[in-house]
């Protein structure tokens, strides 16, 4: 069955973006927009689409959760042995995208990615809820085939016996954080009549950022 959505459209009229009034640092604007999304009760505003591409030149995308905005990029945590981890090992160029329909906004981040310090990953892992720590050990490897859900549940329950509530769960060597160092970041604000505002920050050789407006 085919479906036709060609007549479905909305008029975006909730905001505007002026190149003359934005801060020099894209991270300052990212923080401002993120805080506004939180205040407007956007559901999981820190959820972002992460696009990777390995040596096979086949792109893949999935949702991951932003956990930190640094002075040079953004940090998330995952399984290093996952499909995304394999892509990253072969090609460090990635893109991330936030889309907040409630605010009619997008943020597109392009950059290079690398593992963060293992001690920092371990510190974050130990802050996670106990069952989330245990669950991380079930995915060996993440995206690997499993016979059925019962096998997963049995592994999880056995791990909970091995590491009961209150016991320290070791940080897996295959699990940790990545930081995307931003080379370019685009802020998109929906406008009426498809005349959207698009401002892109580009990182220069000296580490500063220049800005320009893009056609919608």
From Swiss-Prot:
Q: Which UniProt keywords apply?
A: Flavoprotein, FMN, Oxidoreductase, Pyridoxine biosynthesis
Coiled coil spans: none
Entry's cofactor comment: Binds 1 FMN per subunit.
According to UniProt, the reaction catalysed is: pyridoxamine 5'-phosphate + O2 + H2O = pyridoxal 5'-phosphate + H2O2 + NH4(+); pyridoxine 5'-phosphate + O2 = pyridoxal 5'-phosphate + H2O2
- According to the lineage, what is the superkingdom? Bacteria
Q: Which major enzyme category is it?
A: oxidoreductase
Query: What is its cofactor?
Result: FMN
Please name the GO terms that the record assigns under molecular function.
FMN binding; pyridoxamine phosphate oxidase activity
| Binding locations of FMN | 62-67, 77-78, 84, 106, 142-143, 188, 198
Q: Does the keyword Metal-binding apply?
A: no
Q: Which family does it belong to?
A: Belongs to the pyridoxamine 5'-phosphate oxidase family.
Q: What is this protein called?
A: Pyridoxine/pyridoxamine 5'-phosphate oxidase
Species of origin: Psychrobacter cryohalolentis (strain ATCC BAA-1226 / DSM 17306 / VKM B-2378 / K5)
């Amino acid at each position: 069955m085919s479906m036709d959505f060609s007549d479905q459209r909305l008029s975006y009229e909730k905001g505007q973006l002026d190149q003359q009034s934005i801060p020099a640092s894209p991270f300052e604007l990212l923080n401002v927009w993120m805080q506004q999304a939180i205040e407007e009760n956007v559901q999981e505003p820190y959820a972002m689409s992460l696009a990777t591409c390995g040596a096979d030149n086949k792109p893949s995308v999935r949702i991951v959760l932003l956990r930190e905005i640094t002075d040079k990029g953004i940090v998330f945590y995952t399984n290093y042995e996952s499909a995304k981890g394999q892509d990253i090992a072969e090609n460090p160029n990635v893109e991330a995208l936030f889309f907040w329909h409630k605010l009619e906004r997008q943020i597109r981040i392009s950059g290079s990615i690398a593992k963060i310090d293992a001690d920092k990953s371990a510190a974050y892992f130990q802050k996670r809820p106990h069952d989330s720590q245990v669950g991380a050990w079930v995915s060996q490897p993440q995206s690997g085939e499993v016979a059925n859900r019962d096998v997963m549940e049995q592994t999880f329950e056995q791990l909970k016996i091995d590491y009961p509530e209150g016991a320290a769960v070791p940080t897996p060597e295959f699990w940790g954080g990545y930081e995307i160092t931003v080379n370019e970041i685009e802020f998109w604000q929906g406008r009426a009549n498809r005349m959207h505002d698009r401002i892109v920050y580009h990182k220069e050789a000296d580490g500063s950022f220049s800005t320009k407006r893009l056609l919608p």
